[in-house]
A protein has these predicted regions:
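Acidic anion/phosphate-binding donor-loop and adjacent secondary structure
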Residues: 27-28, 105, 111-114, 120-137, ...
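Membrane-proximal helix-turn-helix segments that form the acceptor-binding/catalytic region
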Residues: 35-93
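Carbohydrate-associated surface elements
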Residues: 99, 119
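A conserved mid-protein helix/loop that constitutes part of the nucleotide-sugar donor-binding site
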Residues: 140, 149-166, 185-186
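Nucleotide-activated donor-binding/catalytic signature segment of Leloir-type glycosyltransferases, i.e.
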Residues: 187-209
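Aromatic "clamp/platform" in nucleotide-sugar-dependent glycosyltransferases that forms part
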Residues: 229
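Short hydrophobic beta-strand element within catalytic cores of glycosyltransferases
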Residues: 237, 245-249
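A charged, aromatic-enriched C-terminal amphipathic alpha-helix characteristic of glycosyltransferases
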Residues: 280-317
């Protein structure tokens, strides 16, 4: 639904819309320019030819204004609003968690919504990471996987790192995530925060890492920390759990539907206490149990769930 498309022939019997979370509604209602830029990829180009008419690569992010001003903003949002509202009202809705389902109900007043969690490549993370782990003593990294974006609240991870370093917990923290050019300023702020808190020897960033690189870091890790409060689902958390990492997550959002309560925190200080306990008292068998607990998020389970929804739609059409 983040890039809404609507056709007049759509109905709840012949169209399915996956709604991750009703964020698009609020972006459109508030006429959020950043939504046009980051979600829809719309930018107002700078001059694409230099004074001497030399060709300039218009696909180079450096040649785009970082804060576009759209002269036809009202028109864009009217079109989006028409398409989005009709799409949501005239299709069968699927979302990723009960947390997201409740948010959609509050936004649209419709309660006929299916919950189908996205599939996780469990075997890749379980076989390559968990089964390859050696002695627990060598796996002391705290891992964060997140896009480098302001709403992901990466600063919470940095605050946690400060507490853990001061208490001599873990060998360090690694933050792995993709970075897009329009969040370069935020990334610079995070790096400055690391410098100011004296964490350059404890916390490192791995930007735009490959899957092989990510799996290599997972092999070094024991705990996964999730910094964002109110996460809608959290695929990275499940991938880490598949690899046998202990998840430490906020006690609000879709994550609470599958992360054991003893690993949920309300404050950064509580998160630090949980991690200290994991490092000093938790046996390796608990990591294996965590990995085995997420089989319901497999590809095969997702396919079965989606087929069930399709069969219900087809049976309605036959009536």
């Amino acid at each position: 639904d983040a890039s809404p498309y609507y056709h007049s022939c759509f109905s709840k019997d012949n169209a399915i819309t996956y709604c991750h979370f009703p964020s698009t509604k609020y972006h459109i209602d508030s006429e959020n320019i950043d939504y046009l830029k980051t979600d829809l990829g719309m930018t107002e180009r700078s001059n694409v030819f230099s004074d001497n008419k030399d060709y300039v690569d218009i696909n180079n992010p450096k040649n785009c204004k970082t804060k576009p001003q759209f002269s036809r903003r009202k028109e864009y949002f009217e079109i989006l609003k028409y398409g989005y509202w009709n799409l949501m009202r005239n299709s069968t809705l699927i979302t990723n968690s009960e947390f997201s389902r409740r948010a959609i109900v509050n936004a649209f007043g419709s309660d006929n919504i299916y919950v189908l969690s996205p599939p996780i490549d469990i075997e890749t993370f379980r076989n390559v990471a968990l089964m390859a782990n050696g002695d627990d003593e060598t796996n002391d990294i705290i891992l964060v996987i997140s896009r480098i974006a302001p709403h992901k609240k990466i600063e919470n991870a940095i605050k946690l790192a400060k507490i853990l370093k001061d208490n001599n917990v873990s060998k360090g923290m690694k933050i792995v995530g993709n970075l897009y050019y329009y969040f370069f300023d935020y990334y610079s702020e995070l790096k400055q925060m690391v410098l100011d808190l004296g964490l350059t020897d404890y916390l490192t960033f791995e930007i735009n890492a490959s899957l092989d690189k990510l799996l290599s870091i997972i092999r070094e890790s024991r705990v996964y920390f999730h910094p964002m409060i109110g996460e809608h689902f959290g695929m990275a958390v499940l991938e880490a759990m598949a690899a046998g990492l202990i998840p430490v997550v906020p006690n609000e959002g879709g994550l609470t539907e599958f992360v054991p309560q003893e690993y949920q925190f309300n404050t950064i200080e509580q998160a630090a206490e949980i991690i200290m306990h994991v490092f000093t008292h938790l046996p390796k068998t608990e990591r294996i149990k965590i990995s085995n607990d997420i089989n319901k998020f497999s590809n095969s389970h997702y396919i079965e769930g989606f087929q069930t929804i399709l069969n219900e739609l087809l049976s309605r059409r036959r009536k």
